[in-house]
Amino acid sequence: MKAQISRRRFLATTATTAAALAVPRVLTAQKSEKQLVIGEGEHRYEVLHDWPQLPDKYRWQTTHNVAVDREGLLYVIHEGRENQKDHPSIFVFDGEGKFVRAFGNQFQGGGHGLEVRTEGKEQFLYVTGYQQLKNFAKLTLKGEPVWEKHAPMDSGVYPKDEDTKPTKRWGRDAFMPTNYAFLPDGGFFLADGYGSYRIHRYDKAGNWKSMFGEPGKGDGQFNTPHGVWIDNRPGREASVVVADRANKRLQWFTLEGKHIKTLDGFILPANIDSHKDVLLVPDLSARITLLGKDDKVITHLGEDPEWREQVLKDGMKLRGSRNGEGWVAGKFLHPHDACFDPAGNIYVAEWVHTGRITKLRKVA
C-alpha cells in the first residue's frame, strides 16, 4: 500500500465515491451454525477469515498480494519489516490452508506484487518490490531466483542511479512497481503504480520494450495505476485493463496501449483477476466488486456504507488493531488484492498491520 496516500485524501476519496457505482442492493452476511455466507444468486461465498495459519515462528507484516498455482497452492506476499531481514516475505499454503514453505527474505520491507505464470511445463513466480527495493524479479515456485531487474532506464523516465542506487524516494520520476499482466507472446506488462504512473512492456526475457500512459485524469492517463490484467474473457478480443486507483476507475487498452474505454464509479480499485465471464476487483475501501461479461456490476461483496464509516473512522484506526478488535465477521477492511482459484473460490489479502488472508469458498 502506498505510504504517501494521506488519511485525509483516503477519507475524502472514499466518502465522495462510495455510492457512485450502482449497487444491486446492500448485502448482509447470512449466518448459520456452520457458515457465514455473503453474496447473492450464483455468486455466494462462505467467508473463512484467517484461513491460512502461519507457524508460530512467523508473523504477518501487512499482507499485500495473493496468487494460486495450477496445483492449488496459495502464495502470499507481505510487505515485511525492513529491519527483519531474516524473516521471509512469501508464504505458501496447500488447499487446506496448511503451511508448506516460506522464502523471499530479500523482499522484506518492500514486498508488494505477486503472480504465478505457467511457461511451457513449468510455473514461475513474478514478484515486485517497492519502497527501498524498487525491483521486480522472476523466481521458481521454491523461491530460487531466475532474474532480478530494476528501473528501465531506456524509458527515459527515471533519473540517474534509480536502477543502481535505489532509495525510499517517492515521486513521479521514481520507480515503484506494483503488479503484472502476462502477454500471450510470453512478455508482460509491469505497472509502475506508485512511481511514474506508466505501464511498461517487457519481452519474455525481461527486456524493456515500450510503455504507455502518464500522470493525469484524462483517458489514457493515470493516478496510481496499481493493478493491471489481461482481460481475455470468453467472447472478447484480449485487452489490458488497468485499476486506476486514485482516479476511481478501470481503463481498458489494446495490447499496444491504445485506449478503448473507461469504467468510472469505483472507490479505490486495487487490482484485477478473472474467472470465466467474471472480473474480480478488490477495492481498498472495504468491498470486493464482481463485474459480469458486459462489465456491469454483479455485486459488491462486503458492501456496507455504515461499516465503511467505521473502517475509516479515527484515521483508519481499525487497520492497526493487533488482535482484530472491532473487526466484523463477513466484512472487509482494506482488500488490497484478490484472486480466483480454478474452482471459483476467491482469496483476499488485506492491507492491515497484522495481515489477513480470507478464503471465500464458493457455495453457489
Q: Where in this protein do the model-derived segments appear?
A:
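Eukaryotic scaffold repeat domains enriched in small/polar residues
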Residues: 30-364
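N-terminal secretory signal peptides and thylakoid transit peptides that target proteins
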Residues: 1-17
